[in-house]
């Protein structure tokens, strides 16, 4: 029963939480009012240049490079290795496997071997630098240790405790096509699989969600059009409030004609 729950029910539960959680965060960010232009300067003035700027932010993190080159180095290589590993794992989700996925296998394999190094760097940076340690929270360390555990268990599966790949692909394809089955899987793969599902559940509710939050950041997705008049969409005409103790007409100067009439 535990095996059935781990390999059949839990994957769908974690995938549902991941999908709904990400959509909920996007919905919250999209409905957040941004009444002012707070774009980071120098800023583009056209929509096309804004899109190009955000693509650059996603691909090579220029803002981080200007602020902290060592952090940029660790973060850049971590993200590159992570994407190569994810692309390599597409072979378990696709049948037949496309040629470009087959071509990524060797590169993704070496990326999996190297990904612990930038993770160790990012973890050491939080522990050694006093300022970073002071502002770090439990979630920061949890995410790093979780990804590290996934990477190490994956390396062990590839090098020392090899699992029959056909059974693994049968498991994944069964989940993808809603025909789940429970093949004979080693305990280490079960641990690796469980850690990935924990990451999926945690992802929408932690700082890892910055991957999608970048597209909703007003400092990056706005144009530098400060000269254009902007009207708040929630503005509405405000009527007279009888409870107002200081109505403006009480203190408004009387017209000259009315003052002269009072003198007569």
Show where each model-derived region lies.
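Long, highly hydrophobic alpha-helical transmembrane signal-anchor segments
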Residues: 1-25, 170-194
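Hydrophobic alpha-helical membrane-embedded segments
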Residues: 9-40, 86-89, 119, 151-155, ...
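Membrane-interface helix-loop-helix junctions at boundaries between adjacent transmembrane segments
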Residues: 1-8, 35-38, 101-105
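Membrane-interface amphipathic/juxtamembrane segments adjacent to transmembrane helices
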Residues: 26-64, 229
